């Protein structure tokens, strides 16, 4: 029988809201509270050699920096960190010894698939659990996705992810990718699901996956109060309650509420996230969420006008944000008398 686990990504995906500046003590407190809640996996941020990060940020240039925010007793919780493919050299990773992160998620664009596989192999050779995370699942044809699954079956990551990068997936889309995985991925490899809430479907899509009969173990990503870029993510506090009621889970909600009081709610008061019409439009056209932010921040467009601009974004420009490109579309729209 499948096991369903929660991966909380507040400190990583939530960092898009506040530029990862949670504060050192708040980072430690968030990790502590999630461990107290019994959350299975905590993603503590990004590992990258592309910047010089302070102790107040949930971005780290070394494994030693991650160790400083971890408590001595993690109970049964695993600690994860994400690497964007190309941002960190696996040669810099120390051999896994159980005192730092347990799991490393490798996130990559379609063009980086072979590079990502090689990175995953090196990370796995150092003893870490590896999560294989191809972004923007909807950008893959069935044949392309089956090719990724075939790669995964050869190097055997611990988890293979379905990623709804733009919050565009409806249930039929989740089903499409899940059954490609179910029928072709090695049963020993778990299936992960990372979503964004642009269409208010993160919760229902997660429930759909949780209810499926499958031999694959599942990992569902969520964040406290749904904290994340744009529309945010699945709410940890909601999905915890759902699994407690439907899957005989035993998560504790009070520590999560403590984290909300201590850290997350104060951030929300100054920099909110959640559903927006601009986010809906970016999802409708399967575009990077930064396009929605750019157009919304102009404060000059009607939503009809914004829709018109989104409709002109070429397919090859949708997945990766191009500020110069969207600025040209915006200028052309306004010059033509748009509003």
Features from the language model and the residues they span:
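Catalytic cores and adjacent flexible loops of soluble metabolic enzymes
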Residues: 1-339
């Amino acid at each position: 029988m499948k096991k369903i686990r929660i991966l909380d990504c507040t400190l990583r995906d939530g960092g898009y809201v506040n530029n990862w500046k949670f504060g050192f003590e708040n980072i430690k407190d968030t990790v502590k509270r999630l461990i107290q809640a019994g959350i299975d996996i905590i993603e503590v941020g990004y590992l990258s050699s592309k910047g010089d990060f302070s102790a107040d940020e949930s971005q780290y240039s070394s494994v030693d920096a991650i160790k400083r925010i971890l408590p001595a007793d993690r109970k049964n919780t695993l600690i994860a960190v994400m690497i964007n493919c190309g941002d960190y050299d696996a040669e810099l990773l120390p051999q896994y010894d159980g005192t730092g992160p347990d799991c490393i998620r490798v996130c990559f664009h379609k063009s980086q698939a072979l590079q990502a596989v090689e990175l995953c192999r090196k990370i796995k050779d150092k003893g870490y659990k590896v999560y294989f995370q191809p972004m923007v699942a909807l950008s893959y044809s069935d044949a392309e996705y089956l090719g990724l699954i075939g790669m995964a079956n050869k190097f055997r990551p611990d988890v293979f992810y379905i990623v709804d990068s733009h919050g565009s997936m409806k249930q039929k889309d989740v089903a499409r990718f899940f059954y490609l995985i179910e029928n072709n991925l090695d049963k020993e490899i778990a299936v992960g699901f990372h979503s964004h809430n642009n269409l208010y479907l993160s919760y229902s899509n997660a429930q759909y996956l949780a209810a499926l009969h499958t031999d694959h173990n599942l990992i569902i990503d969520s964040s406290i109060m749904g904290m994340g870029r744009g529309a945010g993510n699945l709410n940890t506090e909601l999905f915890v309650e759902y699994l407690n009621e439907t899957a005989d889970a035993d998560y504790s909600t009070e520590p999560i509420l403590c984290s909300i009081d201590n850290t997350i709610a104060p951030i929300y008061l100054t920099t909110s996230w959640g559903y927006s019409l601009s986010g809906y439009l970016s999802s409708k056209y399967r575009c990077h969420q930064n396009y929605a932010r750019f157009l919304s921040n102009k404060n000059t467009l009607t939503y009809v006008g914004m829709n018109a601009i989104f409709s002109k974004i070429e397919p090859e420009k949708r997945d990766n944000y191009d500020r110069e490109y969207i600025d040209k579309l915006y200028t052309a729209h306004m010059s033509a008398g748009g509003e």
